[in-house]
């Protein structure tokens, strides 16, 4: 990532093994019921995205966690519909939420987006708003978890670290609100 003095970032991404999934590799995986599975938009928008979604559709009792990232606009509509039919927990930043709202014909206003998301997909949603914290929406609850005060040095990796914190919280049995709180804490340490 290239960071300009004003904090604007430009990413140069190159695909590697993470986008080379094949049927043989997936067939060897044992996924226990109740597992959390992380997928990135880079994987889902790559040529192996179709294969990953086909594999996901066959799994029972798992929670997909999807961080679409900047590739949210690159996933074909039909594949995106199949992904959302798996009722994943989706984590978006502010810009990605705007793109998602447009793609799914939902409101871009965060609280309305969350309500409409629940009505349309019955799946959890996290919207990360940098220093304003993160909103979470689920069938059970919704709310905004404030960000932790921090001295921002470098925001590269903030979204990934937030995802890691949320996943660690969920894997530990925390409810979504507390998992988002942990994600906020981890992201504040990284930036």
Segments the model singles out, each with a brief description of its role:
Residues 1-39:
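Conserved N-terminal subdomain of the carbohydrate kinase-like
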Residues 3-8, 81-85, 107-110, 141-144:
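Short, hinge-like loop/turn segments at secondary-structure boundaries
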Residues 15-18, 70, 95-96, 148-150:
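Short, acidic/turn-prone active-site loops that include or flank metal/cofactor-
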Residues 18, 63, 89, 124-126:
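A residue-level structural signature of the nucleotidyltransferase/glycosyltransferase Rossmann-like core
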Residues 23-26, 52-53, 75-79, 111-114, ...:
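A generic local structural motif
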Residues 32, 85, 120:
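Structured loop/turn residues at beta-strand edges in well-structured enzyme cores
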Residues 36-111, 132-134:
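Conserved beta-alpha-beta core of the PfkB/ribokinase-like small-molecule kinase fold
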Residues 58, 102-191:
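Conserved phosphate-binding/catalytic region of the ribokinase-like
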């Amino acid at each position: 990532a290239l960071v300009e003095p004003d904090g604007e970032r430009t990413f140069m991404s190159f695909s590697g093994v993470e986008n080379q999934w094949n049927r043989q590799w997936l067939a060897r995986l044992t996924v226990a019921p109740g597992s959390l599975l992380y997928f990135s938009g880079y994987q889902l928008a790559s040529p192996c995205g179709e294969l990953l979604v086909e594999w996901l559709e066959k799994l029972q009792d798992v929670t997909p966690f999807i961080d679409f990232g900047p590739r949210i606009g690159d996933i074909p509509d039909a594949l995106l519909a199949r992904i959302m039919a798996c009722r994943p927990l989706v984590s978006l930043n502010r810009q990605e939420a705007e793109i998602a709202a447009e793609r799914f014909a939902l409101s871009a206003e965060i609280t309305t987006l969350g309500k409409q998301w629940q009505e349309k997909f019955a799946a959890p949603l996290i919207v990360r708003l940098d220093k304003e914290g993160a909103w979470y929406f689920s069938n059970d609850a919704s709310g905004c978890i404030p960000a932790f005060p921090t001295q921002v040095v470098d925001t590269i990796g903030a979204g990934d670290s937030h995802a890691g914190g949320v996943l660690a919280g969920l894997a530990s049995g925390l409810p979504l609100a507390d998992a988002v709180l942990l994600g906020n804490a981890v992201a504040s340490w990284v930036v």
